[in-house]
């Protein structure tokens, strides 16, 4: 039996940090349902390279997960999502701060309705403070954190570390 067998995770994350975290939970035996936007899904579905028409990047981060397309602005889809929430143990999200609150699914609202639900969120600059609303792609985090100042050629411009270490570490901590 896997350590997280019987645990249901609703994964509203996208790109790398969040899907890395939910992928780890899936690897540990949780049932993970990835909730994606209709028509476009996770941005990484469009990231090359492609194998048999599918993004290898997306496939690697989302292996072992189930997927459902829901528009959380549409009443019918909200009803489906709320039925999933009633059964879920964990919900993960990595939207910019305030998005889940505007949808009516922020921590306070979910905690009131589903007090046993574990709510995990990751954002580049936190959920409060002067930079909370800024996007934080890995290159931005590497630059702001200073790691790019110690890479590359001496006397040359800063260079991004090849691996997306900021996103991977954020995903590890979200797990």
Task: Locate the predicted segments by residue.
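N-terminal helix-loop segment corresponding to the beta1-alpha1 unit
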Residues: 1-175
């Amino acid at each position: 039996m896997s350590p997280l067998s019987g645990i249901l995770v609703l994964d509203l994350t996208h790109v790398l940090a969040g899907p890395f975290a939910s992928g780890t939970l899936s690897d540990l035996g949780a049932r993970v349902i990835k909730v994606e936007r209709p028509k476009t899904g996770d941005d990484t579905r469009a990231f090359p390279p492609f194998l048999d028409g599918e993004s290898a990047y997306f496939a690697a981060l989302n292996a072992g997960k189930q997927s459902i397309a829901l528009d959380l602005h549409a009443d019918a889809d909200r009803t489906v999502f709320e039925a999933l929430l009633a059964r879920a143990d964990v919900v993960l999200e990595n939207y910019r701060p305030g998005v889940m609150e505007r949808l009516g699914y922020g921590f306070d609202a979910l905690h009131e309705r589903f007090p046993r639900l574990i709510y995990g969120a990751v954002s580049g600059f936190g959920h409060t403070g002067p930079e909370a609303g800024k996007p934080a792609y890995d290159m931005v985090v590497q630059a702001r954190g200073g790691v790019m100042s110690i890479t590359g050629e001496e006397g040359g411009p800063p260079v991004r570390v090849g691996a997306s270490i900021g996103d991977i570490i954020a995903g590890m901590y979200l797990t």
